[in-house]
Amino acid sequence: MRNSVKWETELTGDRSRRREADESSETPKIVKKEKRSKTVIASLRPQQPPIQEEEEQGIADRRAIRSQYLALTHKIKDAKDDLTKIDSNKFNSIINEVENLHQKVRKPREQIADAEALLDLTNSVVSSVKSQSAHGGVSPAEFVNALINGFGKTSLRIDADENTQVSMKWKDLGFTVCSTVLVSCGCTTMMGPMYSEMKQRKSRVGNRKRTKPGAGVKPEEVDDTEAEKKSDTDNNMAVMFNILRKNKRVKIENLVLNRKSFAQTAENMFALSFLVKDGRVEITVDNNGSHFVEPRNAPAANLVLSGEVAYNHFVLRFDYKDWEPMSKMVAVGEELMPLRETKVAQDSIELSRKQGSVIQEETVVEDSSNMEGDNEDSKNGGL
């Protein structure tokens, strides 16, 4: 027996020595790895400037906020059963703490802690409400106690003493409940005529026979001669560009103004805007704020498509109040655009001439028809 015990002790001693040797051989490797990693991290990190006291203070504040949120989550878990009780004010106190801490949150880590705390509070309230609905909801005694707490004149409850009488503030209770049960009681009257007769239904009309479509008619072809004609704006643009070719550099008010017609001044502005849009005219501003108009060659289409040339647009406000000071500012005789004659009188004359020709044609047709009728009567009489 002694020999066996000695043998076992020797075996256990050898095993323990081997384990210690192995552990001692492994520990320096771990230490070396840690040292290497530390040296690598130190070599990778650049030399950072010393942290200021304000940043250290901000980090400390953030840690304090996170610790407060952690304590608040533990508090929510501990008070899980008391949050939805009628007599308990823990829910209000916890939600006030969450709101106060939320005012201090500035960084994402604290925002995550704030969201987690609010989520824990919501989950605890939802679980407690579900448990109450599963067990039958609020009992009648709890409902009456809640009414007494809210609208009772004394602080006594039904559980305190059965013989005590509790007076209620029925008026306040009625005001709070009336918003949910608003029902208006009106008079039972009849709206509409006193004698109402049944309207007879109209008899249905059978489907009308549809006529077959006739033969296709080909419309007459009309020459587009009017489309080829230039509009008034194109003519004004051509006249204005020729004026700019002759004078090279002109003030905008001298070019646009028509002293006798505000409408033609607006038309000149319209023509100038098209020239600017096409790139054929350039508007510049000198040091005194005067606007000058100069002719230029329009850019090629490929330059516009490639983006090398870009158009700049602007909005100009011009009305009768602007036209009056412009006519005073420009001297008489310095207007460049000519006065265009209106075609209203000519159009009215042509229209009256056309109407006269139509009337004459109608009279001729009537006379010819009468003559034909007389001829037929004479023929019949002769026979």
From Swiss-Prot:
It comes from Arabidopsis thaliana. It comes from the Eukaryota. InterPro entries: Nse4/EID (IPR027786), Nse4_C (IPR014854). This is Non-structural maintenance of chromosomes element 4 homolog B. It is found in: Nucleus. Disulfide bonds: none annotated. GO terms for cellular component: nucleus; Smc5-Smc6 complex. Component of the SMC5-SMC6 complex, that promotes sister chromatid alignment after DNA damage and facilitates double-stranded DNA breaks (DSBs) repair via homologous recombination between sister chromatids. GO terms for biological process: DNA recombination; DNA repair. Interacts with SMC5, SMC6A or SMC6B. The SMC5-SMC6 complex is composed of the SMC5 and SMC6 heterodimer attached via their hinge domain and from the non-SMC subunit NSE4A or NSE4B. Residues 355-372 have a biased composition (Polar residues). Keywords: DNA damage, DNA recombination, DNA repair, Nucleus. The keyword DNA repair applies. Belongs to the NSE4 family. Residues 201-212 have a biased composition (Basic residues). Residues 1-59, 198-231, 355-383 are annotated as: Disordered. Residues 1-22 have a biased composition (Basic and acidic residues). Not expressed in seedlings, rosette leaves and floral buds.
